[in-house]
Structure formats: structure tokens, C-alpha cells
Amino acid sequence: VLDESLGMKNFRHSLSHKKWLIGRKIDNIRFYNVPPVRALQHLLFDVEYDNFTYDISNCDELSQFLSRATGINESELAGYIAEILNDETLHTEISGRFKRPARFGRRVGWYALIRATRPAVVVEAGVHDGLGACAILSALAKNNHGKLIGMDIQPEPGSAWLIPPHLRTRFEFIAGDIAETLPALCERERIDLFIHDSDHSEIFEAMEYEVITPHLPQGAIVISDCAAPVGNIPPCVLEVWAQQQNRHFDSWQEKPIGHFYFGAHFGISLDKSQTESSGNAGIHRNVTQP
């Protein structure tokens, strides 16, 4: 009787999860106005219902955007983007854990920026499964310099489970409500690069920027995964914050290949003194050598 009861409980839990999953996928189909055939594929076969992964078609625009924002040579940035796209070892490691191809999307821009600027401390607020963290940690490993502090409300192994063991030597994970854990982190760390990829509500994103503002060193870079075009009405949270802090803001939208998602806006903010000196050539780079 006990076995039957447990079996029925597991069955009901599985059925409830499947209903929830179908509901999420139907929401996606409606929100993104997915064509009928692709909608059926999403409903029946896609394992992803959010945090979609895909390759992008406009990597050339990405290197141009990063060069425009930072003043770093475009060819250097394009080279770093090609580096991660062609890193067969990294792709094989992640694909083996992910059970599907590793598609970084806009995160290749994070990689290129880290390779070029060599930050000592990167903070990613909102790690999720760790795909972005893999790109960040790979860049830090190539630099032989720096560490990543990942934050998420969900503890491991639910978060950051994609990260291969050899990349974890530069990784620190902080579980808990970011509204509570971020202030304590700022008191003990000098954040060179902050990536907002957590709760995308305006209130929560603004809270993160408010917390980090007094602790950002000169030359710090702030990235948002949910920005909007420059001058958008209303402006996105990162642009508003950048204006308030007299910082430079720019953004770019990725173009997913073969996916119904329209692509995220990659926003970046840095000191105006960096972008205005020597035609943007004043971007801070950590020159510590391995």
C-alpha cells in the first residue's frame, strides 16, 4: 500500500509538472506569435521553455558595438568572439553535460569583453544553469587572471551545474536572495565587471545598481541582459542609471538563428571619462600579467 501511495504521489507530481510545462510553452507561443508548425515543434520537442539557447547571426555587429562602446580595436574583439566559437574542447564539455549543443548567443560578447579588459573580479547576478558562467570562466582561464562570483536564489546543484570541474577553480557561488547577499559582497569585493542577469523586473534591476554604485571602482563596467535601444521611450533601467551616474550607455540586440525568440538587448555602461578620452581609447584594462 505504501509503495502504491508513493507511486501515485510521484505520478501526480510528474503529471502536474507536465501540465505546467505545457502551459509555459503555450504562453511562449502566444507571446512570441510563433508560426503553427514551429509552435507544434516547440510544444512537442523543445526541452527549453525559458532561458533559450541559440547561435546568433550578427557577431560582426557585436564586435562593432563593443568596439564603439569601449574603444577597443574591433578586430581584437572579433578575434576573441571567434576564439570561443571555435573552442571545441569547451563546446564538447558543455554539450556532454547539457545533452545538446552549447550555444552561447550574446554571451560570446561577455567572453570577448573579459578577454580584452582582463577584470580581476566579475560578478554575475543570476547564474541559472551556468551557461554564461562557462563563457566567463573560460575567458578568465585564458587570461590566467581573475575570478567569477556567481549569485542565484537557487542553491547548487540546481544552479551552475553546467560548469566543468576544471573551470570551478576561479568560481565562487553565493546562494540566496540577491537583495540580501549583494550588499555583503560589495563590502568585501572590488567589482570590475557586473552582469545583471537575474530578476528582470525594473524594481529589482534598479535595486542591484543602487547597491553596487558606491562600491564601483573607476573603470568598472556594468552589463544588463535586458536593456533596450539607446533613447528608447521609456528608457531601460540601465540607461536611466547611467544617466543618473553620468556614465556612458550603449546597447545592441542579438539576432538568433532558427529560433522564434526575437533576441535580447545587451546593454553596457562605463565611465564617460573612459569613452571620451582619445576617441574611446581610455577604456580600463587590467594589465596584470600571468
Predicted regions and their residues:
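Intrinsically disordered, low-complexity regulatory regions of eukaryotic regulatory proteins
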Residues: 1-2, 122
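Rossmann-like AdoMet
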Residues: 2-99
